[in-house]
């Protein structure tokens, strides 16, 4: 049984895949398995995976016949994972040579999840640390709360038992894997930080940066997260915390709509408004922080969707006047 199983979901990343796989197979910790799931790539990615599998038995390749999204691909790999601990590496990212060794050193006592040190890697060669307050360990509940607004990141390794009990959320093709990260932190007794580096390649056309109707999936993924919290019997305090974050995210997505609606098709604009209207109608306002709800731009105005939209239009117009819509 390997010490660590790494899930690598692959879709059309042939240009970066060798760097990713080379970084995994050259780890100072040799006792690993690399579970690569090709999500119906149309480039040479699958050929590259087979080449690596032929050279190193630690690489296992699974090919999907149709594109199902990252969460599904990772779940396919997860179903075959046998390591004591399980993590993921995106197929265009890579690890420092000692990253997994440092992760293993941090799994002690009642630590159930270990975060990497994340460095953003830019096309011009610049590197920048993910900004978060330093810590050695925190409780799972503290980590869960910090992850709601990404005060801590989601690049980590977790105990097999937790990951197998809580596979990736496939409710949306984008963003819903964030829910799984939060659930893993929620169920961890302790979450630790290590200095092993995860290099996170910055792509200007990634889902998180792209001007696309898929950005509104973020709100639907949030809704799925709430359903999971309810099914897990989360405390009222946790639900209040998350519902406040959901409300802030709704206003944040309205800002995206305000700034970029002319770059979206009519159909996409209508879809975005429909999703936001649904969240506005169904969010549990009694669980949203009162201090947030009293602020102009954040007042629910549940009596009228049109009035709420007017508030948002005026709010973001005023922000634009003073140069704050960035």
State each model region's role.
Residues 38-47, 66:
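A conserved acidic beta->alpha catalytic loop
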Residues 64-81, 88:
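Glycine-rich, basic loop-to-helix element that forms the pyrophosphate-binding segment
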